Amino acid sequence: MAASLTLMTSPPCSRSSKSPSPSPSPSLSCNQQQQYKPLLHHQWPPQISLKKEKSNESIVAKSPVIAAATKGGSPSVQEQKWIHEGVITESLPNGMFWVKLDNCEDLVLGYISGRIRRSFIRVLPGDRVKIEVSRYDSTRGRITYRLRNNKDATTT
């Protein structure tokens, strides 16, 4: 027990100085060199790897952070919306409309999506539309498609 205490209390490195008086910066001499490992295992900035996809032969750059985030089963934006069909009852300024949903008597305040705006698709009261309603606020939605006639309305 005493031998183990002396081994535990003896320092692994011995101080060597030229004078017996303590110097401000003594040098350490060790038999074993300790290698320090970095605390972070990844490098900054992240290394970007370029690889070709076989499906469309385009080069896709993925960083390790983005690739790790997409591997998980995170829900996409489309899963957080309910898609309904309805009839526009009233037109409001700035591309907003009151939409009456088919499955219930609810009125939803809908705004025109960017694709419909970009394509200059005219939406008027009385038109049938597809609307994405948010799960978090069921009184608002995005008008994503204007149904042209009864054939489009029945083939959803």
Curated annotation (Swiss-Prot):
Purpose: One of the essential components for the initiation of protein synthesis. Stabilizes the binding of IF-2 and IF-3 on the 30S subunit to which N-formylmethionyl-tRNA(fMet) subsequently binds. Helps modulate mRNA selection, yielding the 30S pre-initiation complex (PIC). Upon addition of the 50S ribosomal subunit IF-1, IF-2 and IF-3 are released leaving the mature 70S translation initiation complex.
Keyword Thylakoid applies: no
Family recorded in the similarity comment: Belongs to the IF-1 family.
A GO term from the CC aspect: chloroplast
Keyword terms: Chloroplast, Initiation factor, Plastid, Protein biosynthesis, Transit peptide
Biased composition (Low complexity): 10-20
Protein's name according to its UniProt entry: Translation initiation factor IF-1, chloroplastic
Pfam families assigned: eIF-1a
Provenance organism: Mesembryanthemum crystallinum
GO molecular function: ribosome binding; RNA binding; translation initiation factor activity
Stretches for region Disordered: 1-35
UniProt keyword Protein biosynthesis present: yes
Domain S1-like, residue spans: 72-148
Residue runs in coiled coils: none
Subcellular location: Plastid, Chloroplast
Gene3D superfamilies for this protein: Nucleic acid-binding proteins (2.40.50.140)
Chain segment of the transit peptide: 1-49
SUPFAM superfamilies assigned: Nucleic acid-binding proteins
